[in-house]
């Protein structure tokens, strides 16, 4: 085989905002729990989209997160999303002389977007068409209760697609 392999990706690239020690049995989270499958509420181990969740709760995501977390900031921020994470892993294990890994996408011109852009630039992935635009950075709020299920732990996920909608 001659020539360089080029792997290009577009899709889910976001920040994961991890909140540790969220008590899934607390009064703060109870109003936001799912009552039946697919209703837009929170369910252990499952992801819900921001639009569905806000409709279910009748409140903005920022207000809901503040209520659930007691207004505290997330404990950890990471690069997330299956598209970019798999591309980063591929770029880390391949020879850059033989394989070029590229990503195309969007994030917001907010602090999370600046974090994401800065973090992505430290990876071996080539940001071919990655721009910060006037929209919210795609994010997943990860609520973690390590005591849930008799100490086995579990997470609940709320995804905001934000600027990713604007990639054309």
What are these regions (language model features)?
Residues 18-23, 113-116, 142-143, 159:
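Short acidic, glycine/serine/threonine-rich loops at helix termini
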Residues 103-106, 129-132, 140-168:
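Conserved phosphate-binding/catalytic loop of the ribokinase/pfkB sugar-kinase fold
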Residues 80, 94-98, 121-126, 162:
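Glycine-centered loop/turn motif at secondary-structure junctions
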Residues 82-86, 112-116, 137:
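Generic hydrophobic, aliphatic-rich segments that mediate packing or membrane embedding
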Residues 119-135:
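A glycine-rich helix N-cap at a beta->alpha junction
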Residues 105, 109-124:
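Short, electropositive alpha-helical surface patch
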Residues 2-102:
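Glycine-rich phosphate/adenosyl-contacting loop at the front of the ribokinase-like
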């Amino acid at each position: 085989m001659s020539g360089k392999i080029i792997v290009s990706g577009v899709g889910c690239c976001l920040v994961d905002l991890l909140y540790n020690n969220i008590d899934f049995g607390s009064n703060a989270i109870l109003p936001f729990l799912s009552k039946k499958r697919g209703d837009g509420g929170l369910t252990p181990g499952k992801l819900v989209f921001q639009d569905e969740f806000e409709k279910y709760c009748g409140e903005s995501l920022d207000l809901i997160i503040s209520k659930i977390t007691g207004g505290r900031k997330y404990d950890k921020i990471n690069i997330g999303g299956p598209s970019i994470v798999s591309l980063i892993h591929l770029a880390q294990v391949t020879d850059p002389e033989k394989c070029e890994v590229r990503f195309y996408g969007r994030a917001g011109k907010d602090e999370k977007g600046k974090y994401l852009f800065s973090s992505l630039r430290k990876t071996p992935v080539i940001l071919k068409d990655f721009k910060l635009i006037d929209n919210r950075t795609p994010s997943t709020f990860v609520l973690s209760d390590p005591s849930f299920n008799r100490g086995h732990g579990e997470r609940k996920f709320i995804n905001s697609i934000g600027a990713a909608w604007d990639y054309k």
